[in-house]
């Protein structure tokens, strides 16, 4: 694995980390309508309405970037895997905040999409991402749209914090079956992915009820009226996929999985301040959560992909299940 390059300018880091994020799918309607607030910067009303799309799928109205493309994992389908010889860089929280604000002031972007490789361990990486979001919302008074991809295996407190500081959260499903996950992403498991996904779904539902909304996310168009919709749990068909599918690993939202997690240390960086100052009256991920699956890396049929998506929609009330085409450009030749 290449070492992180030191002495890079912010522009050089941006070139590396924006390019490294191009295989993350983020482009969709934001799902929130928060208006501008006096004394704050930005709003989320127009996000998701006037997006432009680059040829490689990037959404140009969001700054789509990684916190770091360093990664301790070696997922065979990933450009940033440990064994791949690519330039590595890492943003510091304040450095990334400055970049977001300057881009926003120049009307380049309407918001931020933040993902990351894994530096040291999942909790350390998630802490750096939360520090960035916390500084944006407090020090920089940024009120625009934020979509953050959480890191499976990070501490529950930090994943929860990300929900309070962002508009949409994601936990990448990665692959539709356990067999493919074991083969192509041996450091990951359905348990470490579905556990935070379930807890996020539970918290989102509780916050929606607290403000007088239905527990489930609203669906648009004809999906609100179709009894047999893919989202409708009351009229669902059998979603089980045998021994390999997600339904056999589904955790009840809010339940505790058996995954090992590193714990955030109270004295680390901004953690004490963030936990103390976090405004839990803020809406929790008001635009819901989404996920992403790689399609074509394993031997799954279209039927399996659709059934997996249906199970995720019904069990975790996801707003979107994105499918990203497997590409040899990012893949391990093995």
PLM segments and residue spans:
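Short, acidic/polar
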Residues: 100, 159, 302-309
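A conserved active-site cap/scaffold subdomain adjacent to cofactor or substrate pockets
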Residues: 309-318
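Conserved small/polar residues in nucleotide/adenosyl-binding loops
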Residues: 326-334
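Local cysteine-cluster metal-coordination motifs and their immediate loop/turn environment
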Residues: 70-80
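Class I SAM-binding transferase module
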Residues: 285-287
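Flexible, acidic/Gly-rich N-terminal and inter-domain linker regions that tether
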Residues: 1-70
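Core AdoMet radical
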Residues: 81-96, 104-129, 135-156, 163-270, ...
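Active-site glycine- and acidic-residue-rich loops that bind
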Residues: 152-153, 296-307
